[in-house]
């Protein structure tokens, strides 16, 4: 679950580790997000580069399965971020328990096919009982 949100954060950063401000679109499950080369409330990521992330999450439900959805919102049009493994259990040992805390480190390669643009990245973790966490990050994708 936590690794899932990490992937979301992946889609926004680059040069030295820092805490990233994000909008919570869930119910406070995500406690912190660190992205290599990024800090504050706006991240710039570069196509073709690797992105290192660390995220802290507390599960809001018991769940045997986790699904990760990550989209880029570009001028109101939501586009699925390519290359994301949607099976959250590949990142976190399932099943998970309500109240369980996760600290996950994740590395993601920013696809070169992404457009150069400003975007909001929306990452959602979905468990057996619905939304397990959600964050929005403001940023920009550059060459």
Swiss-Prot record:
Q: Which Pfam families match?
A: E1_DerP2_DerF2
The signal sequence is 1-17
Q: Show the GO MF annotations.
A: sterol binding
Q: What Gene3D superfamilies does the record tag this protein with?
A: 2.60.40.770
SMART domains per the UniProt record, alphabetical: ML (SM00737)
Asked if the keyword Secreted belongs to this entry, the reply reads yes
Q: Where in the cell is it found?
A: Secreted
> What keywords sit in the KW lines?
Allergen, Disulfide bond, Secreted, Signal
Single GO cellular component annotation? extracellular region
Instruction: From the record, give the cysteines joined by S-S bonds.
Output: 25-134, 38-43, 89-94
Question: Which GO BP terms sit in this record?
Answer: sterol transport
Task: Give the family, as the similarity comment puts it.
Answer: Belongs to the NPC2 family.
| Name of protein | Mite group 2 allergen Pso o 2
Q: Which gene encodes it?
A: ALLA
């Amino acid at each position: 679950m936590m690794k899932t949100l990490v992937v979301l954060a992946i889609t926004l950063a680059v040069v030295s580790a820092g805490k990233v401000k994000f909008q919570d679109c869930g119910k406070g499950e995500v406690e912190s997000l660190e992205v290599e080369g990024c800090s504050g409330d706006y991240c710039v990521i570069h196509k073709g580069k690797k992105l290192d992330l660390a995220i802290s999450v507390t599960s809001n439900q018991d769940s045997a399965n986790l699904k990760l959805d990550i989209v880029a919102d570009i001028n109101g049009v939501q586009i699925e971020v390519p290359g994301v493994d949607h099976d959250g259990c590949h990142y976190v040992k399932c099943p998970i328990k309500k109240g369980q805390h996760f600290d996950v480190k994740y590395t993601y390669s920013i696809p070169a096919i992404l457009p150069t643009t400003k975007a909001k990245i929306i990452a959602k973790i979905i468990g057996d009982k619905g939304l397990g966490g959600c964050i929005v990050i403001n940023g920009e994708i550059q060459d």
